[in-house]
Regions:
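Sequence-structural signature of mature extracellular/luminal beta-sheet repeat domains
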Residues: 1-286
């Protein structure tokens, strides 16, 4: 934010929080459920991907997630940052319930792309997908469905490409945008009708992402405990280590957008570090 604060979703805390430069915290609105990705819209309101709530269980070798005890489905919420008024914009698309909305990005036209990660149960899982919606609650469309575990979403600087990072496959997919809310679907065997930009070897898992002004895609990478920077051509430019095995998101701030704010979820902290390249300024960033 322009005042140096950062707004983020606390899934386990079931709230949206503003963190001031001095580290003080203030809850905004009453999100409930499991607020995840947050973005500022053209009206200055906060738009929240709410996964409906999640339970995290840790074993010696794996961190698993499942629906919370009061889970009733996911939604896209709108929160007025001044009054705290919170309301649900979308909880389904064409009669199909949203499962666990995860990440969100606005285009310059005022609409937004968002991912639905899906939900893991004991012996089955809901599929995820990529969607596009308008902030007035009038329209939501399904762009890609089903996907395995679509997580981070971002736009190229020219807004001709939408990127989706898939968690379990640790692959970055790209889809060509024909017009706002409409993507080009390539025939089989194109993955999900798009293209696979890059995949990582070994056991690494992608989470949310941000885009640099150069067009490189910066993806929070679980297990490896780093931010993976990938060029639009698919080259792994660098991996920047962070002091946490579960970095889940990254955004850029500061006067020249060279400060990277990174959520460190294993330790429950927000970290900040100087970044070698400026980030891409988000639409409607305030």
């Amino acid at each position: 934010m322009s005042d140096g604060s950062v707004i983020l979703g606390e899934i386990s805390g079931r709230k949206v929080t503003r963190i001031a430069p001095d580290g003080s915290k203030t809850e905004i609105g009453k999100a409930g459920g499991g607020p995840n990705g947050v973005a500022t819209g053209p009206d200055g309101a906060l738009y929240v991907c709410n996964n409906g709530g999640a339970v995290y269980q840790t074993s010696p070798s794996f961190l698993s997630t499942g629906p919370g005890p009061d889970y009733k489905g996911g939604s896209i919420q709108r929160i007025d940052p001044k009054t705290g008024e919170t309301r649900v914009l979308y909880s389904e698309c064409n009669g199909h319930k949203l499962s666990a909305p995860n990440d969100i990005v606005f285009d310059s036209e005022g609409g937004f792309y968002f991912t639905d990660l899906g939900k893991r149960y004991a012996n089955q899982r809901d599929h995820g997908g990529l969607y596009y919606a308008l902030p007035d609650g009038s329209k939501v469309v399904e762009l890609v469905y089903p996907m395995l575990t679509p997580n981070g979403v971002g736009l190229s600087p020219d807004e001709r490409t939408v990127y989706v990072a898939d968690t379990e496959s640790s692959r970055l997919f790209a889809f060509d945008i024909v017009e706002p809310g409409k993507i080009k679907h390539e025939p089989f065997p194109a993955p999900y009708g798009g293209r696979c930009v890059c995949g990582l070897p070994g056991f690494q898992r992608f989470d949310s992402l941000a885009v640099e002004a150069s067009g490189n895609i910066c993806i929070a990478t679980l297990i490896a405990g780093c931010i993976t920077v990938i060029s639009p051509e698919g080259e792994v430019v660098r991996q920047v280590k962070v002091p946490d095995v579960y970095p889940t998101n990254i955004c850029f701030g500061g006067p020249d957008l060279r400060i990277a704010y990174i959520t460190l979820s294993a330790s429950g902290q927000l970290g900040a570090m100087e970044w070698p390249e400026p980030g891409l300024r988000l639409n409607f960033m305030v």
